[in-house]
Amino acid sequence: MAQPVQSIDVLLIEHAELELALADPELHSNPAEARKAGRRFARLAPIVATHRKLISARDDLQTARELAAGDESFADEIAELESRIAELTTQLTDMLAPHDPHGPDDIVLEVKSGEGGEESALFAADLARMYIRYAERHGWTVTVLDETTSDLGGYKDATLAISHKGASDGDAVDGVWSRMKFEGGVHRVQRVPVTESQGRVHTSAAGVLVYPEPEEIGEVHIDESDLRIDVYRSSGKGGQGVNTTDSAVRITHLPTGVVVTCQNERSQLQNKTRALQVLAARLQAMAEEQALANASADRASQIRTVDRSERIRTYNFPENRITDHRIGYKAHNLDQVLDGDLDALFDALSAADKQSRLQQV
């Protein structure tokens, strides 16, 4: 959920308090709290640094104006400082705009086939490969947690975990969620299916769900008594030996009916751990959506971005065109997009989101 605009004075006080707390050995006796405080401190640091630069530039401008009263050679310096102040003011305003607290997070992404039978499943697999290739371009790690394949090798459904930890690219500091949070919704494809003998273009669709993954499972309260855990024999593409033991795990959260399965890790314990992480992500998303609905039923969510029944994008193969209906984006490079070249589209979506946030300032 987007955070409200905050006063710079409040943030400066919080930053100073966190700096003192992080220097206190007592805080580090609770590693989880120490990590939480450290993440918040790191989040505030660039805001504080920009504010200090702005104050310094304003002081320099005042001095330059006083000196210019007796020496016209300072006029150029005044113009430079005024330009610098305008730039810093814009940066600080952007930083203080409502932001997404999950920006640095990794994600769990689900792809599900929809109407269209086998063609929809094949398209769902195309989407999964598109996201995997995009992640590879950025040095992110992708783990296929669960998958159900169709007769022709498509995906009836697949669950991916995408992590930026250890990545070396510059975008990684913002997290996977900040780049991929706009992907949730219905994706429509227009093309000639492999099963079409008459060469006619068909329309089908697949759904994508995206959840920010909590830094730690403990950040989301899950009562063990609310869980039913079943184990069974894996049936995915886990390689030789994957089917020989009951290593797959299915977890049902009884109060909500949410079911999570994981079968592609090498052991039952690993599958259970990953399934709990996915469950935590889903429950966190559900809680935030409910809180948002309670706060304002008619306000557009910047985290969920669209109703999941809404068509957000069309992939037109005959024209090699991709269209994002939310922002009116069109490009004739569908082949490149499906190969993971998504940055131009994601930049456009991020720019539209930024503009929306700035309007709330």
From Swiss-Prot:
Entries under Pfam families matching the protein: PCRF (PF03462), RF-1 (PF00472)
GO MF: translation release factor activity, codon specific
Gene3D superfamilies, per the entry: 3.30.160.20, 3.30.70.1660, 6.10.140.1950
Subcellular locations according to the entry: Cytoplasm
Post-translational modifications: Methylated by PrmC. Methylation increases the termination efficiency of RF1.
The entry's keywords: Cytoplasm, Methylation, Protein biosynthesis
Annotated positions of the N5-methylglutamine modification: Q240
GO (cellular component) term, any one: cytoplasm
Listed HAMAP family: Rel_fac_1 (MF_00093)
Family membership noted in the UniProt record: Belongs to the prokaryotic/mitochondrial release factor family.
Role played: Peptide chain release factor 1 directs the termination of translation in response to the peptide chain termination codons UAG and UAA.
Designated name of the protein: Peptide chain release factor 1
Organism for this UniProt entry: Mycobacterium leprae (strain TN)
Gene that encodes the chain: prfA
